[in-house]
């Protein structure tokens, strides 16, 4: 080889474009970055069910020709009338939702998931709206059922959560109700999966 060959870029390009510099070293760097990142990235453990917006309190009174949605004043508060389909002589008085700062989200979980749910855990209730986007109400678990109830032939536990109102919500609306039961890093998660 003469000295002109050493000066050409063709010689160095051929010499240093081997398999290890093009594939193995970048892949090793990527794996190293993923391992380091797994120590800092947080993974949330959740349990999910369908939740229903319900009032925090109701009053049952005798029906005196009330109609559905009528606003009446009782006990120095305004209430909205809801007629009971099963009992014609009873009406339920619901607090006006806009006057309240919070609502109850009632959801049901099977026995294999109820052990992870504890009082005070965060809830992110998701409601689909007419715009095609999702509204989110943030709250926390207020009560966890201690004995199962029969719902559509299944034994489930009732979980009542209290959520702050900041969206246009109506009683009876249903949505996705994930409850965050714990947090861990992805490194701890993969370590537990591999070792167990």
UniProtKB/Swiss-Prot annotation:
TM ranges: 22-42
Keywords (A to Z) from UniProt: Cell membrane, Membrane, Transmembrane, Transmembrane helix
Any one GO CC term of the record: plasma membrane
Source species: Lactobacillus acidophilus (strain ATCC 700396 / NCK56 / N2 / NCFM)
Membrane topology, record value: Single-pass membrane protein
Subcellular localization(s) per the UniProt record: Cell membrane
Keyword Transmembrane tagged: yes
Protein name in the entry: Uncharacterized protein LBA1794
First-listed, main subcellular location of the protein, grouped into a coarse class: membrane
